[in-house]
A protein has these predicted regions:
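A short, N-terminal "cap"/entry segment at the start of jelly-roll beta-barrel domains
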Residues: 2-7, 17-60, 104, 146-153
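A short beta-loop-beta micro-motif enriched in histidine and acidic residues
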Residues: 56-59, 71-84
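Short acidic-glycine-tyrosine-enriched beta hairpin
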Residues: 68, 99-116
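Histidine-centered metal-chelating micro-motifs
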Residues: 73-75, 110-121
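Short histidine-centered beta-strand/loop micro-motifs
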Residues: 74-79, 96, 103, 121-123
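Glycine- and acidic-residue-biased ligand/ion/polar-headgroup-sensing regions
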Residues: 79-98
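Ligand-binding loop in jelly-roll beta-barrel domains
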Residues: 115-141
Length: 153
């Protein structure tokens, strides 16, 4: 009988010690707000066309990391919904096929890509790494090749 009470006492002691450790750990945390830097806030794509709508249906965010070798042109393509490109490293030159507009985006910069306009990106002398976030919906591809072109990725 004494053994039963001793085991219960040990269990209670361990539970109390665990709780005390959790409380001490939380007390050691410094609570503070982070510093915000808006990288991109826009209602239009880089080529000047306004975003008109989001796709209907269940929203689905998709973020990809795209690595493109030096001196590479991606195939011509479109996107069916808004997305944001952030250049982690390298340089990306965007080309709008219909208008001929171009935009050079450097490491640390973000840009809103065009929706339904045929475009592509080209890299410079070094590998370019992009972080791309799409505001889409399930079942709809994030990139659609232009007629006669291969997939962007």
């Amino acid at each position: 009988m004494i053994s039963k009470y001793r085991n219960a006492g040990i269990a209670a002691l361990l539970a109390g010690a665990s709780f005390a450790a959790i409380v001490a750990q939380d007390a050691a945390l410094h609570v503070a707000s982070g510093q915000r830097e808006i990288l991109l806030q826009t209602s239009q794509s880089w080529n000047g066309k306004p975003y008109r709508h989001y796709p209907a249906g269940q929203p689905q965010l998709t973020t990809i990391k795209l690595t493109i070798g030096p001196h590479t042109a991606l195939p011509w393509h479109t996107h069916p919904f808004p997305n944001v490109v952030y250049v982690l490293s390298g340089t990306l030159t965007l080309h709008d096929k219909a208008s001929g507009k171009t935009l050079v985006v450097h490491q640390g910069q973000a840009v809103g890509e065009s929706v339904d306009d045929v475009h592509r990106g080209e890299t410079g002398d070094e590998t370019t790494v992009l972080l791309i976030t799409y505001a889409g919906t399930p079942g709809v591809p994030t990139s659609i090749p232009a007629k006669g072109e291969q997939a962007e990725y």
